[in-house]
């Protein structure tokens, strides 16, 4: 019988090999907290000492929360979703992630919630990645000056407060003054650029609806679809029925989707409708989290809430891809008071504002643009050269007309020059009126404004101005298509071009019949005397 020998070296080697190759079963080390308070869309959580600011927390029913307050003993978080199932004592776990949203071309033509989930019933969205909501805006060296036009299709805006790609232009005014209409028409006006298929002309649009009625959001979507603009537009919807947390986050979601396209070298237009309601939602969340209130009960960082959002709109340098994101934030005022807290904050952040006035709106002037306090600080360098050429005197002429109109209201006798100026001003005011969902092309605006400011419409009755303009532009597109194309594609108009436009207008006037049955051509000799 063979003798059993035990070799200590073999046993030692076997033990060493086993120890070195041993891998324990993956033991999950997870911090688990407890809900101590829940309600009104917020929750207080104890027992997560390593949680980060703006980290996502997961509740027992799968609902997510966003950590906003990191206090000594507990965390104050805003619940992202339905909060009725969250109760005291329930466990809460960390996710180790910050809030992000899926991005990509699949968002075009879709309606999504503030977390990027589709809510239009058209199935899942094909995405190309994810982007964090809280990202730094482009630095100074990554930017370039605004120099390309972003036309709204409104003569009053494009002539007097022009907007450039990468600019932040505030639309401000009381409720029911046409703010959303101006923004939606700007989206519709990008339709012809989109259909060219040229990436340098195409503009992807994002409409962020914050605290709007569901019916209003549906009507905006319907208007975009009816006018062929939904195919290049994304709607981020946080209706009035959504929790305050969603209304606070919606603009950042839209901005993240747009930034992805901007950094890919594409052009984006984003509309925030409206930031007053976002500030109200943030105030509600902050007060529920016991943050100290400041002016008008807003928290101390409400300026930063909007500045870090709007600073993301930029025109990138060529080295960064030359993309752009143009922002049109909307702010609602009370009784035309632009000196309130939120309006003054956003005015100081943006590059200009279009002030829409309820008195002008009710008087039938639409868009109801108050020329006196509306301004574009950087858009002048981006304005189409032909438009800049013809609109130079428009603002001054209108301001003088308003002053003269107020003076004439006293019934004073006016000299012939003042009467002439008053009559031309009335025609210019009528000329600047436009119907909703009917934005005008650049060449049509240029011809229309030039004809008005140079007195080519002085003999047209005020009641016939808009019909004269419509029929004149139809005549020019029919008879002088080459001339209209040269205005659109060229820069500053030459003397020959201006002469050709003047001759075409003169030829049309001879065949235009006024509402009282007269031909303008018949009155021309007497008007010249």
Swiss-Prot record:
Pfam families, A to Z: ATP-synt_ab (PF00006), ATP-synt_ab_C (PF00306), ATP-synt_ab_N (PF02874)
InterPro entries according to UniProt: ATP_synth_asu-like_sf, ATP_synth_asu_C, ATP_synth_asu_C_sf, ATP_synth_F1_a_nt-bd_dom, ATP_synth_F1_asu, ATPase_a/bsu_AS, ATPase_F1/V1/A1_a/bsu_N, ATPase_F1/V1/A1_a/bsu_N_sf
Predominant place of localization: membrane
Location within or outside the cell: Cell membrane
Membrane topology: Peripheral membrane protein
Subunit (UniProt): F-type ATPases have 2 components, CF(1) - the catalytic core - and CF(0) - the membrane proton channel. CF(1) has five subunits: alpha(3), beta(3), gamma(1), delta(1), epsilon(1). CF(0) has three main subunits: a(1), b(2) and c(9-12). The alpha and beta chains form an alternating ring which encloses part of the gamma chain. CF(1) is attached to CF(0) by a central stalk formed by the gamma and epsilon chains, while a peripheral stalk is formed by the delta and b chains.
Protein name, as recorded: ATP synthase subunit alpha
């Amino acid at each position: 019988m063979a003798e059993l020998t035990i070799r200590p070296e073999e046993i030692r080697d076997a033990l060493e090999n086993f120890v070195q190759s041993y891998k324990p079963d993956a033991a999950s080390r997870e911090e688990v907290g407890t809900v101590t308070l829940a309600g009104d869309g917020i929750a207080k959580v104890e027992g997560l000492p390593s949680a980060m600011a703006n980290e996502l927390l997961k509740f027992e029913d799968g609902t997510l929360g966003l950590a906003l307050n990191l206090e000594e003993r507990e965390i104050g978080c805003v619940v992202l979703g339905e909060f009725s199932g969250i109760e005291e004592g329930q466990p809460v776990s960390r996710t180790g992630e910050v809030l992000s949203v899926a991005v990509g071309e699949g968002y075009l033509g879709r309606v999504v919630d503030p977390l990027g989930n589709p809510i239009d019933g058209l199935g899942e969205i094909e995405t190309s990645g994810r982007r964090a909501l809280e990202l730094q805006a482009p630095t100074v060296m990554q930017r370039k000056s605004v120099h390309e036009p972003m036309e709204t299709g409104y003569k009053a805006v494009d002539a007097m407060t022009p907007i450039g790609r990468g600019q932040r232009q505030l639309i401000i005014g009381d409720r029911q003054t046409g703010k959303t209409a101006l923004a939606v028409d700007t989206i519709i006006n990008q339709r012809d650029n989109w259909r060219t298929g040229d990436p340098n002309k195409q503009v992807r649009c994002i409409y962020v609806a914050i605290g709007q009625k569901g019916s209003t959001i549906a009507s905006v979507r319907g208007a975009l679809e009816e006018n062929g603009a939904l195919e290049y537009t994304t709607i981020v919807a946080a209706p009035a029925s959504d929790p305050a947390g969603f209304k606070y986050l919606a603009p950042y979601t839209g901005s993240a989707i747009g930034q992805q396209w901007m950094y890919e070298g594409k052009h984006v237009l984003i509309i925030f409708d409206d930031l007053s309601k976002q500030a109200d939602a943030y105030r509600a969340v902050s007060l529920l989290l016991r943050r100290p209130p400041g002016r008008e009960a807003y928290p101390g960082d409400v300026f930063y809430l909007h500045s870090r959002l709007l600073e993301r709109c930029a025109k990138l340098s060529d080295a960064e891809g030359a993309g752009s994101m143009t922002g049109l934030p909307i702010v609602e005022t009370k009784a035309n008071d632009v000196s309130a807290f939120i309006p003054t904050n956003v005015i100081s952040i943006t590059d200009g504002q279009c002030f829409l006035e309820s008195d002008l709106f009710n008087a039938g002037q639409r868009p109801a643009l108050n020329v006196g306090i509306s301004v574009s600080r950087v858009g002048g360098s981006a304005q189409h050269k032909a438009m800049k050429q013809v609109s130079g005197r428009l603002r001054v002429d209108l301001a003088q007309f308003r002053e003269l109109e107020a003076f004439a209201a006293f019934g004073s006798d006016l000299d012939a020059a003042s009467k002439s100026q008053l009559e031309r001003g009335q025609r210019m005011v009528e000329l600047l009126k436009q119907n909703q969902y009917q934005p005008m092309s650049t060449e049509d605006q240029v011809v229309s404004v030039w004809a008005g400011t140079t007195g080519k419409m002085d003999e047209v009755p005020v009641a016939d101005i808009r019909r004269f303009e419509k029929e004149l532009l139809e005549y020019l597109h029919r008879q002088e298509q080459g001339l209209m194309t040269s205005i659109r594609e060229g820069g500053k108009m030459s003397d020959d071009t201006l002469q050709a436009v003047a001759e075409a207008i003169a030829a049309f006037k001879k065949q235009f019949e006024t509402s009282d049955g007269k031909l303008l051509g018949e009155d021309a000799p007497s008007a010249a005397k």
